[in-house]
A protein has these predicted regions:
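Glycine/charge-rich, flexible interdomain linkers and switch-proximal surface loops
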Residues: 50-52
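Ordered, amphipathic secondary-structure segments that act as subunit-interaction surfaces
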Residues: 16, 36-42
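Helix-start/capping segments and mature chain N-termini
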Residues: 1-29, 33, 54-173
Length: 173
């Protein structure tokens, strides 16, 4: 996740002011200080407030690491019995319209709107389609299909990048 944060910064046109090792140590220290048995960790980086406007290339780069107690995105019951998904009217953007491989706050808006709409209609999450109309992911979960032979199939990830998918695709568990 830390390497992805660094790469996302580069994709968005800035370098983080800390090394990979410094960020990982800060993450371990922050998680340890909170003492949660299960936690959600979100490192964030953003441009400073020295300039206001579309071009803010001369601003400082800030970094924070937030930690929340978070046992699971879905309840144990939902995880055992499955969740109800509503196909979102919003789609993951075309890679040529947004920096889709960057973990960028602006891209969360699509999932936030989709999740809210699904919940208003009695669903646990939204099924996100890519810009071509193919299944991409849920707003808070990856989508994997297992065929009769036990082969795992994942969506084509050209409009999003997910660490869990990369781990699975590389043979990790």
């Amino acid at each position: 996740h830390t390497q992805r944060l660094i790469e996302s910064g580069k994709e968005l046109g800035f370098d983080l002011p800390y090394s990979l090792e410094e960020l990982e140590q800060a993450t371990r220290d922050t998680v340890s200080a909170q003492g949660y048995p299960d936690a959600y960790v979100r490192p964030v980086a953003w441009r400073g407030s020295e300039m206001m406007g579309v071009s803010a290339q001369e601003t400082s780069i800030n970094v924070a690491i937030a930690v929340w107690e978070w046992p699971s995105y879905f309840s144990p019951e939902a995880r055992m019995h499955g969740i109800r998904l509503k196909t979102s009217k919003w789609r993951r953007p075309d890679p040529q319209t947004a920096p889709v491989h960057a973990k960028a706050a602006g891209l969360y808006m699509i999932c936030t709107l989709s999740k809210h709409e699904a919940e208003k209609n009695g669903y646990q999450d939204a099924l996100m389609l890519d810009y071509r109309g193919y299944i991409a992911e849920a707003t808070g979960a990856n989508i994997f299909f297992v065929d009769e032979e036990g082969t795992i199939h994942t969506p084509i990830a050209d409009c999003f990048l997910d660490v869990d998918r990369l781990l699975l695709d590389s043979g990790g568990r």
